[in-house]
């Protein structure tokens, strides 16, 4: 499978590592610490754990355009704004929420936020 993961924090990086070890093609979207992560391949929140070389770290969702699945490992409080900003990359593919809780402003669960952008929504 071709998988994109938005969010290179602890959870997103861990998910990317598991899928890469399973032989899947992985693109890990890291807009905030892209250069550091490319240089060290060590996510800030995972200690000394290195990301497998098979993971392609990208700074733009445009590089994820052809991937089949998009896992969103961003905090629930940032999910709605992330989706609005990246709307064009969310349609026509399954979206998998990798976050917990509800949006404090709207009271919406991650699945409800994502359902505004795709009819194919799941929660991990």
Task: Label each residue range with its predicted role.
Residues 1-51, 56-59:
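NAD(P)+-binding Rossmann beta1-loop-alpha1 motif at the extreme N-terminus of oxidoreductases
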Residues 51, 58-124:
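Rossmann-like NAD(P)(H) cofactor-binding subdomain of soluble oxidoreductases
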